[in-house]
Amino acid sequence: MIPLLFILFYFTNCIEWHKFETSEEIISTYLIDDVLYTGVNGAVYTFSNNELNKTGLTNNNNYITTSIKVEDTLVCGTNNGNPKCWKIDGSEDPKYRGRGYAPYQNSKVTIISHNECVLSDINISKEGIKRWRRFDGPCGYDLYTADNVIPKDGVRGAFVDKDGTYDKVYILFTDTIDTKRIVKIPYIAQMCLNDEGGPSSLSSHRWSTFLKVELECDIDGRSYRQIIHSKAIKTDNDTILYVFFDSPYSKSALCTYSMNAIKHSFSTSKLGGYTKQLPSPAPGICLPAGKVVPHTTFDIIEQYNELDDIIKPLSQPIFEGPSGVKWFDIKEKENEHREYRIYFIKENTIYSFDTKSKQTRSAQVDARLFSVMVTSKPLFIADIGIGVGIPRMKKILKM
């Protein structure tokens, strides 16, 4: 299939819009090697070097939920209930991947690739329980979480970070506890990327190092507990985790966490509800290649996978914003080490927050915004096309 080049663009409010031929329902956006991939029904748009291209795939209820780089860059979609992947030029994926790379029906997904190891929260069967899964590849064979470990609405962030000599996978999600009243609890969970699975034939494809710990984001008696989106940014000696939370208070908040502190908690905290002496190796410890956790360690982590700890943010929320925020991204300011401009979007409004001046500004656009991605300039992905540039914004005195 031949990609089509779109050259129609116009400026509005200092944003250069590269327009789609028709208004699109945006399904997914991914930034891979400074190329923006935007999935729609039956096609994927690519945007780089100020050029917008479209590759048609099929129009048979094929919602493109995934763009991912494994050996090649793949785009994957629902394909009318038969998930399938293609190369970016529209040709067939020679490995015929699809299940677990795209859902059976259009839904929000989380999928990442690290050194060609692929991990996702996408069901591999139509009626399957939501799980966090590692696919067969360079990091080992298929692994998945136990029943009901991952909430039905899935994961809201995933990344790999090094802890000592081991690579570890981190995922973020919000659990809902429904007892006398509904309580939402935000978590970050940790697993060893090269986990060898459980010690028996029944557990050999289960994560054997899964642990989780609660995140706190509170200000003035308001507790933010619904994770919307997250982003990890490496610094010289740490990785800073930015997490956007929603709440019932008509407000949202952005909190930051030190991954060094989170890793320390995973390695030193007690397990909630477990009172006996821990075996060796302790639950959650990464083992050398070829080593499998013993039964005693695995049995404990199956029953007690939550730390008796709560991770505090580095400070109070960086800022509070409106509820209903869909997405955010961060740009380090030129010549300002560790000073950032944070862009976030809601409906047809773009917001920016300056971490140095503590000022929030906003601008409205005549488009339905889906996401924002930051390269050398912010990219605003909307139903009408891709917007490039910093809009002319008005200062907000109070959110």
UniProtKB/Swiss-Prot annotation:
Residues 15-399 form the Sema domain. One of its GO terms (biological process) is regulation of inflammatory response. GO terms for molecular function: chemorepellent activity; integrin binding; semaphorin receptor binding. This is Semaphorin-like protein 139. InterPro entries: Semap_dom (IPR001627), Semap_dom_sf (IPR036352), Semaphorin (IPR027231), WD40/YVTN_repeat-like_dom_sf (IPR015943). Interacts with host VESPR. The keyword Signal applies. Its main location: secreted. It comes from Ectromelia virus (strain Moscow) (ECTV).
